[in-house]
From Swiss-Prot:
GO terms for cellular component: cytoplasm; nucleus. PROSITE patterns: DICER_DSRBF, HELICASE_ATP_BIND_1, HELICASE_CTER, PAZ, RNASE_3_1, RNASE_3_2. Pfam families: Dicer_dimer (PF03368), DSRM_2 (PF24995), Helicase_C (PF00271), ResIII (PF04851), Ribonuclease_3 (PF00636). InterPro entries: Dicer_dimer_sf, Dicer_dimerisation_dom, DSRM_2, Helicase/UvrB_N, Helicase_ATP-bd, Helicase_C-like, P-loop_NTPase, PAZ_dom. The record marks K1384 as: Important for activity. This is Dicer-like protein 1. Its EC number is 3.1.26.-, 3.6.4.-. The lineage of its organism: Eukaryota, Fungi, Dikarya, Ascomycota, Pezizomycotina. Residues 888-1016 form the PAZ domain.
């Protein structure tokens, strides 16, 4: 509806506007307003009062864009959640955990354990008689309590189900039987009876299971899976109205306690709104059961006839009364007459309480009962009521009740009164606790009525200790007080209990759950309780075991109460006692009336003609339905769903609930009814997040009709705007922000192959041209301990000057860490052609002698040259650029292809040489010494590595073929010395330590020189050159990462650049997880920088959004920020800039390090291997993570003016959005235009607030109104207090600033900690728990401006608790950990304060750091004390177990809300899913504790499993095939 239309039509009623909007004419005039129709040619909803109109709507399809694996696991969890919601109620009764105590069992198991209804099928003649009648026609069976009405229903059900199965076999549509009950406890009980006697699936549902949220599909599944459904009547009523279930899908409707069918009871609404709306052939059979067809005073015959008409049935009872009396014995009825009671009076305690607290509205009910009890029960009972009405567990409920009433009005006086009431209630509780109660046995303490009850019970239990007794009271307080009294009186053999009804939202100490109610019945059945004080809940339907004494402490008011309560006395020779006051004419009249009414009812039932039909009652039906006239209905033609006045209220409640956002309290629709003349008008106000805020309904003569009419019109308006679907379900599902899952909208699976740079472009530039000038980079090795051989520095000469590289480690000898120190020379050197040729020869000789590769001598094609470097002179100075090269060695190598062996060579000259086998690249040796005791003809010692020829040392060294070997051995010098030598391992990846297999290789050898080549290269140079493959691999990686930075126009230190693009396993992002396909020796990977960059990205975008969108609310900020920082956005930018080419996902390769472009003459060609390695598989999330890591690298690299400048620029590069188009930190200030509220002159109160805070925290506000905004709660009306926006915007900004300052501190303080550790410990620093305690420490709680009394009470309680915790902590800084969670406003205020000082200081991050150092860091100097805050969490353990020990990456931990069951609060189900298997599940009151329990149970299941057993059990192939799933959704430990 347009705003213009609304503004023009303010004076016109909403219903008229609605009619205008729904008419299909081109224009319809409403008053003076012309209302255009919607799209022409489209059929629209038609509304006319008093008629049922229909519509056709287009279906709205849902789009599901999640990945298949996530979708599968989500679907599995949703199915599990639905199943558990059912299972919690429809538990498998064949598997009752009998080893548990009753207190630990659910209601369903308690019912099963008691075997309710077991062995029931033994029908008597009168039951068969009524069964035959019920088969033939709709019937209301009227039989005494205990006479077996349920058995008749079972017989009828079996008959109907048999016919149904036959119909299904003949292809007819499936239909289901519904057994309707009036209470949750009866749903359990009757379902248990049916399951014991019917061999088909029986389900039972009730509202607390969340049935109102089930959609058509869920109901279709239940109808397919079950033949019988037991449920509370309102569930079926709503299903029929929403068209989830249609009347023609039901074959039998059974109404338990059918006398409730009257007025607006769900029984009556089912018949009126759905049953009679269906055509007669589509209506199901009806069977009603009751002990008396009426439960009101008045004309009994008329009431019975009205019941017959409304249920479209005939009342029937048995003609075999004698047989019935044999089965159901009537108790002996007695009257216990007590002396006349005193008039109500005020006890001393009552007077005291009235004088002090008589004006407290919340205690009015207690005052009333205490006044009543003084007469009915006596002085002691009157006073005792105060004790549990003001008990400690009741006080919070009373206070909440007071606050809720206060919040319903905007008057300040009401809120002040509420605060005073809470204080008075606490004071009243203290007075009652201090009061001394008399002994109830003292004279005058109990009323004559209670004294008589005491006397009679003592008599019965002393004469018959096995007595079982039920005492019926009218009031819940009476039952509870009497229970307490008789517990104290301790009558021998009497074991009292209490049974009162469940009443949601009850206060005053009367709360009870369905579970407690049922446990009381179980104990009564077992005899643990033998005297039950009960209200009317025990009268009706509940399967209470035989009693031999029933007492009406408070006399009945209706026939049905009399019949039902008397029916509890089922034991032979039982007594039914009515307590009446002597000389009380009213009591005597009631005794007389119920007996006469019962006789009249019996006569009516017994004299019903056999062939009486209902046709003559049509006029009665019309009269019963007449009051529905004028109440419009609306039907969706496509589905049949119907909207009525009654259903509209429930539909709006569900719609409002669907708007719940994250952890908000459940939103509600608000109804404001006002009188207008002689009529009432209701305004409906929907929650603030609803696109439609509500409307004002039409006038009505009654408040209830006005409310229903407005709700009805609001539903139509929601339909018009497509906010309710074809079943009147909300299109929202407890909606979270749009795109809230954007960060998860990509996959980390290896779904794509991307190009990967193998060599930096610098080697290709100018290749093919002979250089005249070269630039040198010295490679020096600094071992951490002495090496076995000398390693002389070498020089890498390049056409272009190489950048400066950081030092990095390699591992020489037996894993001695050795630092490679590259240093680029500042000036180049001019070289002659001859010098260049000599360097080329030296370089190619290294490749031949050391690496068994012979290249053609093509100087112009070499990408770089190697040369020996001169050592430092005596003064530690290097020679000049030309002098740095050891030309003497270069010349010697150029002039000597090898050192030729001859017999004239002195043996000592063969020591400390580098020798190699020309024909075998595996044989490279460093000679150590001459072995005097060995000859060439001797067999090699047994310790040497095994070779093919082991007959003698000469043959051992020879790798020639058979013929060549024979010729060589015939002509060689057998008298040459034997040398001890070290075999060079084939290992090339010196960037990593030795593997276990490499350590096993024996390197000591004994050789002769003649079969080998003696290299002209000095051993010290050869030793260094053996490390060159690892060194050049690392230098290549540095150069490629620097190219990436150049591509992005970012200046980043080379070590940070490489770290940011290094992915050393398939699942690097899964911190602490067992790394899949781990690449050894790659150095640091991107995970720490990604952690830092992610935090800076969040802060930078938060600042940008805050500065450019001053009118957005926190909700918009969050959503817009998520769109900027989501992985999908980062991935798209990275893909556009081809960042994937620069990512290093492979470690050292033996095939890739060789120079490109040379002609290979001898040796293995690796060009094909290089082509295959030019692609790598990357997940989209990896690429996005690298973007964040590059941001982190920029942050550490600093900037030209501000240390964050390069980080800011990187954020702009990667988010690629106009929302963040800044390249320097100071540009944020230019974007920010201070809003009017900030720059407006501060008033006295605002200045005073700023001064108070400045005294405590030291920061001086230039704009005090920013601070005022930081302490203004969202509940505060905009016209109150400082008239500034609430703190939410500043809190959004401050949250990101706090994250950043904490992350930076941890990052730099703990350089070796992984991101998971950093995250877990950051969680402690930014947790609401800590920030709440800090807010109290800093006194922020005193300054909050809020319009919420509950909030003030919560703050008061929290402050008391946290201050107590601090006082008792003996100086421990982690005292806050043990406290409960604070009200969220307190941590929000701390974050808002940070946002305020940041803005006030012109975006100075230094003020944030100063606050952190002064106020936060002192609590976190020793981070080890917070290890258990998250790291010891079961969820973290589970994550480590699955990822590290089992190598599984395809698992998740899901949590979802469960409906309230057994009268308990709504719970949360959590489940651990591994691949497609649910490993464990658990329920708890919150997601946090459900996840903890599920994780603990999963750890128990996994305990003792070996990895291969795990893989077999859960079909896990993560480790085997190396196909990592998306990042496990394991949840957070906090």
């Amino acid at each position: 509806m347009s705003s213009d239309l609304i503004s023009q039509a303010e004076s016109i009623s909403n219903i008229e506007i609605l009619r205008a909007l729904f008419i299909t004419d081109t224009h319809t005039t409403v008053g003076d307003v012309a209302v255009p129709s919607a799209e022409p040619g489209v059929e629209h909803d038609q509304i006319s009062p008093g008629e049922s109109d229909e519509e056709i709507e287009e279906n709205i399809s849902d789009q599901n864009n999640s990945s298949s694996q996530k979708r599968l696991q989500n679907a599995q969890f949703e199915a599990l959640l639905t199943r558990r919601a059912e299972d919690t109620s429809n538990e498998n009764i064949d598997r009752v955990p009998l080893n548990l105590s009753d207190n630990e069992l659910s209601i369903a198991h308690l019912v099963a354990k008691q075997d309710v209804g077991g062995g029931l099928l033994d029908p008597r003649e009168y039951q068969i008689e009524l069964f035959e009648r019920a088969k033939a026609q709709n019937t209301i069976a009227v039989l005494d309590t205990g006479s077996g009405k349920t058995l008749i229903a079972v017989l009828l059900l079996r008959h109907v189900l048999q016919n149904e199965l036959n119909d299904r076999a003949n292809g007819k549509p499936h239909r289901v039987s519904f057994f309707l009950v009036d209470s949750v406890t009866l749903a359990y009980q009757q379902a248990a009876v049916l399951r014991n006697n019917i061999d088909q699936n029986v389900a039972h549902f009730f509202g607390a299971m969340g049935t109102d949220l089930w959609d058509r599909q869920v109901w279709e599944e239940h109808l397919q899976q079950n033949m019988v459904i037991v449920c509370t009547a309102e569930i079926l009523n709503q299903c029929l109205l929403n068209s989830h279930v249609r009347m023609n899908q039901i074959n039998l409707l059974i109404f338990d306690e059918a006398h409730h069918t009257k007025k607006d009871h769900p029984y009556a609404r089912i018949i009126r709104d759905s049953y009679f709306k269906a055509s007669p052939p589509q209506r199901p059979r009806i069977f009603g059961m009751t002990a008396s067809p009426i439960d009101t005073k008045g004309d009994i015959i008329a009431a019975a006839t009205r019941l017959e008409t409304l249920l479209d049935s005939r009342i029937a009872t048995t003609s075999k009364i004698t047989l019935l009396r044999q089965v159901v014995s009537r108790p002996i009825e007695k009257v216990w007459a007590y002396d006349r009671l005193e008039s109500p009076f005020k006890t001393n305690l009552h007077k005291l309480m009235e004088n002090r607290f008589g004006n407290v509205k919340a205690l009015e009910g207690v005052f009333r009962f205490a006044w009543y009890a003084s007469s009915e029960l006596g002085r002691w009972c009157s006073d005792r009521a105060w004790l549990y009405a003001l008990a400690d567990d009741v006080l919070p409920k009373l206070e909440g009740h007071v606050n809720k009433l206060a919040e319903s009005t905007a008057a300040a006086t009401e809120r002040d009164m509420a605060f005073k009431e809470i204080t008075l209630i606490k004071e009243a509780s203290n007075i009652v606790k201090a009061h001394t109660f008399n002994d109830p046995e003292f004279p005058g303490e109990l009323s004559p009525k209670v004294r008589l009850l005491q006397t009679e019970l003592s008599k019965h239990f002393s004469h018959a200790p096995e007595t079982k007794c039920i005492i019926f009271t009218q009031k819940r307080y009476t039952a509870k007080t009497l229970h307490e009294l008789f517990t104290i009186l301790s009558i021998p053999h009497l074991r009292p209990g209490v049974l009162i009804g469940v009443r949601s939202g009850d206060i005053g100490g009367m709360n009870i759950t369905f579970r407690q109610q049922f446990l009381a019945l179980v104990k009564f059945r077992k005899g643990e309780i033998n005297c039950l004080f009960a209200t009317s809940v025990a009268e009706e339907g509940l399967d209470i075991p035989d009693c031999n004494l029933v007492v009406r402490f408070d006399l009945y008011h209706t026939l049905i109460q009399y019949v039902q309560s008397r029916g509890r006395a089922r034991h032979y020779h039982s007594t039914y006692a009515s307590m009446v006051e002597k000389d009380n004419s009213d009591h005597e009249a009631r005794l007389r009336e119920v007996r006469e009414a019962e006789k009249t009812m019996q006569n009516f039932c017994e004299t019903l003609p056999e062939d009486r039909i209902l046709h003559g009652n049509d006029h009665d039906l019309d009269s019963l339905l007449q009051h529905e006239e004028g109440r419009r209905t609306f039907t969706v033609k496509s589905t049949g769903a119907r909207l009525t006045y009654h259903s509209a209220i429930a539909i709006l409640a569900r719609y409002a609930s669907s708007l719940q956002y994250e952890k908000e309290t459940t939103p509600q629709a608000t109804y404001v009814v006002q009188s207008v003349g002689n009529t009432y008008v209701c305004e409906v106000i929907l929650p603030e997040k609803s696109p439609i805020r509500g409307l004002t309904g039409s006038p009505a003569i009654r408040k209830s009709i006005a409310k229903q009419s407005a709700a009805f019109d609001t539903c139509l308006l929601l339909r018009r705007h497509k906010l309710l679907d074809d079943f009147f379900k909300s299109i929202y599902h407890k909606r979270l922000p749009a795109m809230r899952n954007a960060k998860l909208a990509i996959t980390s699976k290896k779904t794509n192959q991307y190009d990967m740079l193998l060599k930096p472009s610098i080697w290709r530039r100018h290749q093919g041209i002979l250089p005249s000038k070269l630039y040198g980079t010295i490679l020096s090795l600094l071992p951490s301990e002495p090496l076995s051989r000398e390693h002389q520095p070498i020089l890498v000469l390049t056409r272009e000057k190489l950048p400066d590289f950081p030092a990095f480690p390699i591992y020489l000898d037996e894993d001695i860490e050795t630092k490679v120190v590259p240093r680029s020379l500042d000036t180049g050197m001019e070289l002659s052609a001859e010098e260049l040729r000599a360097l080329t020869t030296f370089t190619l000789r290294i490749f031949r002698d050391v690496f068994h590769k012979v290249y053609e001598q093509e100087s112009e094609k070499l990408p770089y040259w190697l040369a020996p470097a001169e050592p430092l002179d005596a003064n530690g100075r290097e020679p000049g650029p030309r002098g740095i090269i050891d030309w003497k060695t270069v010349t010697f190598v150029q002039e000597n292809d090898e050192i030729v062996f001859s017999r004239d060579l002195a043996p000592e000259s063969l020591v400390n040489r580098f020798m190699f086998d020309k024909w075998d690249g595996r044989s490279r040796f460093f000679t150590i010494k001459v072995m005097e005791g060995l000859r060439a003809a001797d067999p090699p010692p047994s310790s040497v590595p095994r070779r093919r020829h082991m007959d003698n040392i000469m043959s051992y060294c020879l790798s020639l073929s058979k013929n060549s070997r024979a010729r060589f051995l015939a002509g060689c010098h057998w008298d040459q010395p034997v040398l001890q030598a070290e075999l060079v391992r084939l290992r090339r990846n010196l960037l990593d330590k030795l593997t276990t297999e490499e350590k096993k290789i024996q390197t000591e050898c004994f050789i002769c020189a003649e079969p080998l080549k003696i290299s002209a290269i000095p051993p010290s140079i050869a030793s260094t050159c053996l490390a060159f493959p690892a060194i050049i691999t690392r230098l290549d990686s540095y150069l490629i990462s620097i190219e990436a930075c150049d591509e992005l126009d970012l200046v980043i230190r080379s070590d940070y650049a490489l770290e940011a693009v290094t992915k050393d396993s398939d699942n690097t992002e899964e911190h602490r997880g067992q790394q899949i396909h781990f690449q050894r020796g790659m150095g640091k990977n991107y995970e720490r920088l990604e952690f830092l960059g992610d935090c800076f990205l969040k802060m930078a975008t938060s600042i940008a959004l805050f500065t450019q969108n001053p009118d957005d609310d926190e909700f918009d900020y969050h959503v817009n920020r998520m769109c900027l920082i989501c992985n999908k956005n980062l991935f798209n930018t990275a893909k556009k800039r081809q960042i994937y080419r620069y990512i290093r996902s492979r470690s050292f390769s033996r095939h890739v390090w060789y120079p490109d472009g040379l002609t290979l003459l001898q040796g293995k060609d690796h060009s094909k291997k290089m082509l295959s390695q030019a692609k790598h598989a990357l997940g989209e999330k990896t690429i996005a993570d690298v973007c964040e890591a590059l941001i982190g690298a920029c942050l550490l690299s600093g900037g030209p003016e501000h240390r964050f400048d390069m980080g800011v620029k990187a954020v702009s590069v990667f988010v690629d959005s106009p929302s963040h188009a800044v390249s320097r930190w100071k540009e944020y200030i230019g974007l920010y235009k201070p809003p009017n509220y900030q720059v407006r002159k501060a008033e006295g109160a605002e200045t005073n607030l700023a001064l108070q805070v400045e005294e405590k925290l030291g920061y001086h506000f230039r704009y005090p109104r920013l601070l005022c905004s930081a302490v203004t709660h969202p509940s505060t009306p905009s016209t109150w207090y400082f008239r500034v926006p609430c703190y939410q915007r500043l809190e959004f900004l401050g949250d990101s600033l706090l994250d950043m300052v904490c992350v930076e501190d941890l990052f730099h303080r703990f350089p070796d900690r992984d991101p998971q550790w950093l995250t877990e410990h950051k969680m402690a620093m930014v947790s609401n728990k800590f920030l709440g305690a800090l807010a109290v420490k800093l006194g922020f709680h005193k300054h909050i401006k809020a319009f919420s009394n509950p909030l003030q009470a919560q703050i008061t309680y929290y402050v008391e608790e946290i201050e107590t915790a601090e006082a008792e902590s003996e100086g421990a800084v982690d005292y806050w950990v043990v406290a409960k969670d604070p009200p969220k406003c307190l941590p929000d205020m701390v974050e808002a304060y940070l946002g305020a000082i940041f803005v006030d200081s012109d975006f100075s991050f230094e003020v944030i750091e100063a606050f952190f150092q002064a106020q936060i860091k002192p609590y976190f100097q020793d981070m080890s004390i917070y290890d258990t805050f998250a790291n010891k969490h079961p969820t973290t353990f589970l994550h480590n177990r699955l990822a590290n020990e089992f190598g599984c990456t395809n698992y998740c931990l899901k949590a979802g809300e469960m409906p309230a069951i057994d009268g308990m609060p709504a719970g949360v189900l959590a489940a651990v899913i591994v691949h497609n298997s649910v490993v464990s599940e658990a329920t708890a009151s919150s997601s946090r504790y459900a996840k903890i329990r599920a994780s603990e149970r999963a750890l128990v299941v996994l305990d003792g499993l070996l990895p291969y057993e795990f893989r077999q059990r859960y079909n896990c192939n993560c480790q085997v095939v190396g196909n990592p799933a998306s990042a496990p959704d394991i949840g957070t430990a906090i």
